[in-house]
Amino acid sequence: MAVRVLIVDDAAFMRIMLKDILSKNGYEIVGEAENGIKAVSQFQEVKPDVVTMNITMPEMDGITAVKEIKAYDPDAKVIMCSAMGQQATVVEAIQAGACDFIVKPFQADRVLEAVRKAVG
């Protein structure tokens, strides 16, 4: 059965890019969200195997969304995808419960490696 992925980013082109990379490699995209609030509700609704999560988004940022998702499901696998690659941001994301951090702009190989690692 295909690994199910929820893609969260406020930029439509980033969602399209991630969807393209992942679907071409056998992953099933089960949902998309453009902010943290929608990410949390989509997660609860579709129960994906992995989430790709941006940090800077309107209404609720990605760090807060990760905390809420992990509170709902401690086993959730969330990969942060952000242009904010400063060490403090990466540490904050990992402490919030993210299992990996990809810095934008990213290579397709890096995304695939992170998803493979997350689902183990």
Question: What residues fall within each predicted segment?
Answer:
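Short, conserved "switch-loop" micro-motifs in signal-transduction and mechanochemical regulators
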Residues: 84-85
